[in-house]
Regions:
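Bacterial N-terminal signal peptides that target proteins for export
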Residues: 1-11
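Bacterial N-terminal signal peptides
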Residues: 12-20
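Sec/Tat signal peptide C-region and signal peptidase I cleavage site
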Residues: 22-26
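Extracellular/lumenal and peripheral-membrane lipid-interaction modules
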Residues: 27-300
Length: 300
């Protein structure tokens, strides 16, 4: 079936075509089977993936799989039902969107040590501003360099630190031992402390559906923080005759009242002039506004 979907100014085509993907061999549900055995393969290109109205990640290219968290299949209508395990990818996020992630998710609790975070790119550094909530909302400013840890997380190393009326030679001086310990023990989701560095875990920092995988490289590019998972240049990409798309293959996938067996589905943006705007929370609105066609292979 080919479905043309439209929401606001976006237009999307949904195609299920058996010629595009070699379906994975059927893996029936069985007691004790691992979630990975029910994973749906996914490949994306030039997708603006929205987590919230003000948080989006530009997926330039990605290959991975939807791994069910519980049960035997990923469910589009339940973003907590699966994780997106990334094999290889290149994705970008603006500093403004990253600041929104920190404010709305990582440091969202009332007793969070940091509030009102803003982030800007200044040449080869991130300039991070915010308020120390436990110190009377004192303003601070930090310039950080970016690198990747051996286990695939993002390291923010403080090169310069300023805080009004507070001596700060490093991370411990700025946040204090109590707050540093709070972060170090993982009680602040998605961020840990290591000496005078902050370690950001994209898998925990971003809201559902969570992304798992190891970041291999990170760089600042224009007004974007670019993360590279694996080695996209060496990956054997499936040829999809579209520029902006999300392609799913193998096993079971449920969306709405429909469950696709031997999933073979491609969501296509027919307008290649800008990225494919996709918002999982509102995908049904796009489906309702569009129309569908059934393929000879009974694809959906």
């Amino acid at each position: 079936m080919v479905a043309f979907l439209q929401n606001r100014s976006w237009a999307i085509a949904l195609a299920a075509c058996v010629s595009l993907f070699q379906p994975l061999s059927a893996q029936k549900s069985a007691d004790g089977s691992s979630p990975e055995s029910h994973a749906v393969q996914v490949q994306m290109h030039n997708v603006m993936y929205h987590y919230a109205d003000n948080i989006a990640v530009h997926i330039r290219r990605l290959a991975g799989e939807l791994v069910p968290v519980k049960g035997d299949l990923p469910i589009f209508d339940d973003k907590n039902s699966f994780t997106l395990h990334v094999k290889v990818a290149e994705m970008a996020i603006t500093p403004q969107a990253m600041a929104n992630v920190l404010n709305q998710y990582v440091f969202a609790r009332k007793d969070a040590p940091i509030k009102d975070v803003s982030i800007q790119i200044d040449k080869d550094r991130l300039k991070i501003k915010g308020k120390l909530h436990n110190k009377g909302d004192v303003s601070f400013e930090m310039e950080s360099s970016l690198s990747v840890t051996p286990d695939g997380k993002i390291r923010l190393h403080a090169e310069k630190i300023k805080a009004l009326h507070l001596p700060a030679k490093g991370f411990m001086d700025l946040f204090g031992i109590e707050i540093a310990d709070l972060i170090k023990t993982g009680k602040v989701q998605g961020v840990t402390a290591e000496k005078d560095d902050l370690i950001l875990d994209p898998a925990q920092a971003l809201p559902p559906p969570h992304i798992t995988g190891q970041v291999r490289r990170v760089r600042l590019e224009g007004n974007n923080i670019v993360q590279v998972f694996g080695e996209p240049e060496k990956y054997k990409w499936v040829n999809v005759p579209a520029r902006n798309y999300m392609a799913y293959s193998g096993n079971l996938l449920k969306f709405g009242k429909l469950t696709m067996d031997h999933t073979d589905m491609v969501l296509i943006d027919p307008d290649p002039r800008d990225p494919f705007d996709f918002y999982l929370d509102h995908y049904r609105d796009q489906l309702v506004a569009g129309y569908t066609k059934t393929t000879p292979a009974f694809g959906l």
